[in-house]
Amino acid sequence: MRVVMVSKALVVGAYQRKLEELAKLPGIELTAIVPPSWHDRRGHRKLDRAHTHGYELLTAALVFNGSYHCHFYPTLGRLLRRLRPDILHMDEEPYNLAAWHGLRLAQACGAASLFFTWQNLPRRYPWPFSFFEQANYRRAACAIAGNQAAIAVLRSKGYRGPVTVIPQFGVDPEIFRPATAAERGTQGNEEPQGDAPSSAAFTVGYAGGLVPEKGVDLLLHACAGLSGVWSLAILGEGPERGRLAAQAERLGIAGRVHFLGHRPSTELPAIYPRWDVLVLPSRSRPNWVEQFGRVLIEAMACGVPVIAAHTGELPNVIGDAGLLFEEGDVGGLTSALTALAANGSRRAELGQRGRARVLARFTQAQIAAATHQVYQQIYRVN
């Protein structure tokens, strides 16, 4: 079966491992179509061709790059006519233009199609997005939901077709792995350079966008309440960076807070093991709640303990392999950090649990196999 996947998320090199795993499976000829870059309020990300073995990775220009709702690929029709897929996998929400455009083109060329959704809030969209959504519900042979709550949203809005819960991407446990003893020794002997945290401190890490809903301001307040020697590494970019740096100055902790900026996904497996804990302090918004928290499974795969806000899908991702605090509770987060800073054996235990949970649920190979099963079901029916 010939499958074409269209995904702006695949500009991230680490995410391409899922496609390498898919391409290994029997009976599939896989092509991915991605934009040369994607930019939004968190910054500009160019395509990183990191994992491209076994399938074809094509680029296609976007119109309205950076607009989640309105972007689309004007040359997609020509590409589909050349590739003649049996299945078109639009890795997009059903309410956006790219998904509607892709599913319409798939219907015209006789291909079955499916979409992906993270949407775990029952939002109502104005026209034309409500029109796109309902049209895609009718055209799609299947849907993939990133979490269980997204299925309930689909059903409440009228989707009656088959749907399966599969996270969008997993992690490769051979790449995201704990540091070896030799690597830990090397890291411990390194001198901090520039804005890198000292290896002698209890190191708290955050990875993700610097946007209000990610709650990095809460993390700064929580860290300001810590005693002893500690440092905070903030990995990522976004419009809040200046405000967060100013907040660190006001709190008197600027010397312990290190803004690392954006790093390629290929560097993350070497960064996470340097941290003693990763924190995801997200806060809900009327139009958004955490849908998965991918950085959690990346850190867990590296044997790094995690702390997250009790919001959205985060408790289901962590299970019993990390600590939770009530959303917005600075004191609760400070207490969780203090407990881990004082107890190395507890950190090691949570790190082991986290990696075991990833190996059981969230590897790229497992997610690729589940996705392949969906493709086979569609192919048999159509």
What are these regions (language model features)?
Residues R243-T266:
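Nucleotide-activated donor-binding/catalytic signature segment of Leloir-type glycosyltransferases, i.e.
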Residues Q134-G185, F259:
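Donor nucleotide-sugar binding/catalytic pocket of nucleotide-sugar-dependent glycosyltransferases
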Residues G102, D320-V330, A339-S345:
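Conserved acidic donor-binding segment of nucleotide-sugar-dependent glycosyltransferases
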Residues E298-A308:
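Short hydrophobic beta-strand element within catalytic cores of glycosyltransferases
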Residues H262-R263, A270-W275:
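Short alpha-helical donor nucleotide-sugar binding micro-motif in glycosyltransferases
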Residues V4, Q187, Q193, P197-C223, ...:
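Conserved donor-binding/catalytic core segment of Leloir-type glycosyltransferases
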Residues R256, P273-V289, V304:
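Acidic donor-binding loop of glycosyltransferase active sites
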Residues K8-V11, P94-L97, L105, C109-W127, ...:
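A short, histidine- and acid-enriched strand-loop-helix "catalytic/donor-clamping" loop
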